[in-house]
Amino acid sequence: MRVIFIINHDDNDSHLIFASGRDSFGRACQAAAIMRPSPSSAPAPLRQASSELTLQTPGPGLHEFTREASAWVAQQGMDSGLLTVFCRHTSASLCIQENAAREVHGDVLRWLDRMAPENDSYAHDDEGPDDMPAHLKSILTGVSLSIPLIDGRLALGTWQGLYLCEHRRRAHRRHVVLHLLGA
């Protein structure tokens, strides 16, 4: 027989303990005592910080801003947490993508062009033939990212970089919000 006990240490700390056989409750209590955090290991209080990057794009493409985001995160002095990145536009977007083989960027852009071509019949064309496809590409790639912060660094893979995807043909000034929650 398997028995489940919920052991509460205080209002903020509870554990599910699985025990079986004779004296299940006694073993569950022993396990809970081992799992109880010591007062010295109390978690650091959460902090948060936010900033806005302004990125000038020369036109369509993937424009890396990993260095700028990483430098800002380092200035915050947090060891662990979560960075949320948000693009404040509907015709640009964000992605985490290959940072070594640049031909990947061309392949991604050509794929997006096939998914949302300029020569389709869109009702919304007030700002030109590249406007509605830019909105659709933004939907496909998204406007927010979440990146864990571990040991004071963004937990990006070796070949990963943070990119603003510019979907319009002409140069734009784009705004990207950084929000870090951590300790």
Model feature map: region roles:
Residues M1-I4, D10-L16, S20-R22:
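Short, low-complexity, charge-dense intrinsically disordered segments
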Residues I7-N8, S41:
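Short helix-onset patch at the extreme N-terminus, typifying the N->h transition
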Residues F18, F25, C29-A183:
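Active-site histidine-anchored catalytic micro-motif
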